[in-house]
Amino acid sequence: METVKRSKVKDLLQSSAYGTEVMVKGWVRTFRNNQFIAVNDGSTINNIQAVIALNSADDALLKRLTTGAAVSIVGELIESQGKGQKVEVKVSHFEILGDSDAEKFPLQPKKHSLEFLREIAHLRFRTNTFNAVFKVRHALAYAIHKFFNDKGFVYLHTPIITASDAEGAGEMFRVTCLDFDNPPRTESGEVDFKQDFFGKSTNLTVSGQLEAELAAMAFGEVYTFGPTFRAENSNTTRHLAEFWMIEPEVAFNDLTDNMNLAEDLLKYVIKHAMDTCADEIEFLKNRLLEEEKSKPQDERSELDLTAKLNFCLNNDFERLTYTEAIEILKNSTPNKKKKFKYIIDNWGADLQSEHERFLVEKHFKKPVILTDYPKDIKAFYMRQNDDGTTVRAMDILFPGIGEIVGGSQREERLERLEKRMSEMHIPAEELYWYLDTRKFGTAPHAGFGLGFERLVLFVTGMTNIRDVIPFPRAPKTAEF
């Protein structure tokens, strides 16, 4: 029976209760000289050192102290004799809770590539890098809920299975119970989805926005935070097939209110992560600096991770229209010298990441909010401006990443919305429930979408989006 209560490594590392008996349970990170055990229990990125007195333990037991083994250690908390931490545990007793075969365990104490760790995503949590990344991810998720809760928003759970395409992109995963080998057919030979589970064609959701708009017309302020899915065959470092989205919708807000809310949210959650994950962010900053050393000088970032985060906290976001941005880009040196991969030569072009990053990193040197985009490159639900060619859209651009938030004031005028849906060949009968909000007490409202993994990517400094979600889903990738 345990007589000593287990302590977390994080608490012990901050303790000065020297001479007290403590118990630590965790996993062996390293064991050297048959004496020094580095133990981590997941409560912190840092290990605690446990010291076994020479010749005090059975050789057979010592041989089982391998990297990855789960252990329980009881001993005296003492002032550390070495550098790096102020305390260590002088071991009086230890036991092996779970063995780890040293020859088979893939995470030996050496540097592993991120590509290799992606292949063993079920074990990569045990590395310092991913311990840090997912602690930051947790902190950001908590901060998002706290931000909206403190402002009186209602957290809305929107459906994962839907019959609508909120973005009109058509890149959706179909949900069906029909027999693939012998699906029922209509008289015209098409698959008869009326005989399917839901009695119609259904898909995994691409966005909870439309449903959030319905709730905003009753609660005033709502937000969603859940998984979304895109069957986009993009095998890049910036795309996932399954990712998480934060989507607030606020009744009576206009585009300016929307920009203010998004800027406040981003600054709040970044500050929370910096305040609560200081050790993790410091580790990730140093990891990034080491990685940068292998790059040519002109490819290295001008800002380290902490400076980049402060760059967003300490600057008011620059606000300008798409039209103003196009003029800046057309007259920019990289555009004139054809250094851009995509040359800007006309109004109406869809901006690429290189253009967005130029505006943020080179021209304004602060985060940027672009507004009033051409209606032809934006979704049907965005409110049309009086000029007939632009809509009240907004994108927030960050250094190193480009677009991190996309949103708009929504079109609350029924006739305008119906006309735009017709122009874009979106069947009104399939979205009758959405149009009903414009028939019964319609009101101005606005909202935006924040891709959670893009946010985590930015705050951690990681460069591949598959490294900021526990088990990434992408083309030909659905392990674990």
Describe the residue ranges of each PLM region.
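Hydrophobic alpha-helical scaffolding
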Residues: 134, 159, 205, 212-215, ...
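Generic detection of long, well-ordered alpha-helical segments
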Residues: 58, 65, 84, 131-138, ...
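Metal-assisted phosphate- and nucleotidyl-transfer catalytic regions
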Residues: 165-172, 177-192, 264-396, 423-443
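TRNA-recognition modules of translation machinery and tRNA-sensing kinases, especially anticodon-binding
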Residues: 199, 203, 217-227, 236, ...
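Ca2+-coordinating acidic residues in Ca2+-binding motifs
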Residues: 93, 324, 454
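Class II aminoacyl-tRNA synthetase-like tRNA-binding/catalytic domains
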Residues: 2-251
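Generic, well-ordered alpha-helical scaffold segments in large soluble proteins
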Residues: 27, 139-151, 207-210, 214, ...
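A generic alpha-helix surface/boundary motif
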Residues: 142, 323, 414-415
